Amino acid sequence: MDFANNPVIKKQIFFDEEGKAKIERSLCTDCLSCTKVCPAMAMKQQGKPMEISEIIDHVLRQELFYHHGEGGLTVSGGEPLSHGDWLIRLLKEAKKHRLHTAIETCGYASYEVLKEAINYLDVIFFDIKSMNDEKHKHYTGKSNQIILDNFKQLVQDAKTTKITARTPVIPGF
């Protein structure tokens, strides 16, 4: 395969001065084409696309394992809030079946999505990597302001949803 002239690689993947492959994530459309042309085969699609009804059916078949506890449906990432419309549809369907619902989020999303999701969530695991904006920018490339603003608003708005704030403990971070 001619990787140098492959349109996916030319658009999304490039090599820096040191010869390291870099991905231009802002151009990513989640088409997964890069997984088909990765010369080192380091990029792979994990999981499989599923319809909401398939996900709910799968979770319901596992009910024996979580019936007496708080098991159910937990949506994690990437970032579930970045797929707002789909997430809301999934959570609504889960609630129709009286499933316990949770998400794991870093909170870097539009608050409007989070505000609507609250109505269908029992638990939110909210990851705050750093309270310090400079450290957060240094290690993630993004300000933490949206995250902290969303968390503050969430605490005010989520009357019946359990919120667990999590912070990773990483030496030197």
Residue ranges of model-derived segments:
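Generic recognition of cysteine residues
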Residues: 31-34, 106
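Conserved active-site region of classical short-chain dehydrogenase/reductase
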Residues: 2, 32, 84, 88
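Short clusters of hydrophobic/aromatic residues that line enzyme substrate/ligand-binding pockets
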Residues: 15, 23, 136, 140
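Short Cys/His-rich zinc-binding micro-motifs
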Residues: 28
